[in-house]
Design a protein with these regions (language model features):
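N-terminal, charge-rich alpha-helical recognition modules
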Residues: 1-152, 156
Length: 159
């Protein structure tokens, strides 16, 4: 009589890997250079990091160095980029409130112009990038301009 090992529990057989969702982020503000960290290159780096889970391989895939990637992550205003990095590596990510300048360190006018970058992933592979307008940053910028204009009017009236 043949003896077969016991079957694993149903939950172990059908268990899937949890899907890693990369949050949208504002690109880190850097100087304009054709060979530097452009917003598209930042998104491509996060996408390749999602695929490879290797900082060295992802940086090499986008034509940059490992050290410069870590420097970019430590820059001011890189909170969203760092959260996307952590999500791509599979770490638990605390949500970043992208609409608050105190959390991101980026002014509303920059967030409005740059927009939100979303990494597109299809079947576990980097598929491209999607740029979304940041409407909350637009509304914050308009409110700031309105307050500034109201303050100027009060000064003009001698108040």
């Amino acid at each position: 009589m043949k003896r077969y090992p016991p079957r694993p529990p149903r939950s172990a057989r059908t268990a899937r890997r949890p899907r890693r969702r990369i949050p949208a982020f504002h690109p880190v503000p850097v100087g304009k250079r054709h060979d530097g960290w452009t917003p598209a290159r930042q998104v491509a780096f996060i996408g390749m990091l999602y695929e490879t889970r290797s900082v060295v391989a992802a940086a090499k895939a986008v034509g940059m160095g490992r050290e410069s990637a870590y420097r970019l992550r430590k820059r001011a205003g890189a909170a969203g980029f760092a959260a996307a990095w952590d999500a791509a590596m599979g770490f638990a990510v605390a949500p970043v409130r992208l609409h608050q300048a105190k959390c991101t360190g980026l002014p509303a006018h920059y967030r409005m112009r740059a927009g939100l970058m979303q990494v597109l992933v299809h079947k576990g592979c980097f598929a491209g990038l999607l740029t979304k307008p940041d409407n909350s940053a637009l509304l914050q910028h308009i409110a700031q301009l309105d307050r500034h204009l109201a303050a100027e009017r009060m000064e003009a009236w001698g108040g």
